[in-house]
Amino acid sequence: METLSNIVKDLRTERDLSQGKLAELVGVTRQTIISLEKGSYIPSLLLAMKISEVLEAPIEEIFKKESM
């Protein structure tokens, strides 16, 4: 089974963004960001691209496929 890990929380805190502010900037709810950071939500490509733009990091750096 494969999962998608991410470093959204690390990058978000490095940039001094709250979950709510990141959610606002990418057009989702704070709960979506919480779920994403926990790994229980896999974003659409469009959302991943928006997060990449806001966090100023390449998508492939933020999101990584892992085998379990």
Model region roles, listed by residue range:
Residues V28-Y41:
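Recognition helix of helix-turn-helix/homeodomain-like DNA-binding domains
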Residues L46-E61:
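DNA major-groove recognition helix of helix-turn-helix/homeodomain DNA-binding modules
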Residues E61-M68:
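Short, charged recognition helix plus adjacent turn
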Residues G20, Q31, E60:
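Key DNA-contact positions within bacterial/archaeal DNA-binding proteins
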Residues N6-L25:
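Short basic helix-loop element that most often maps to the first helix and adjoining turn
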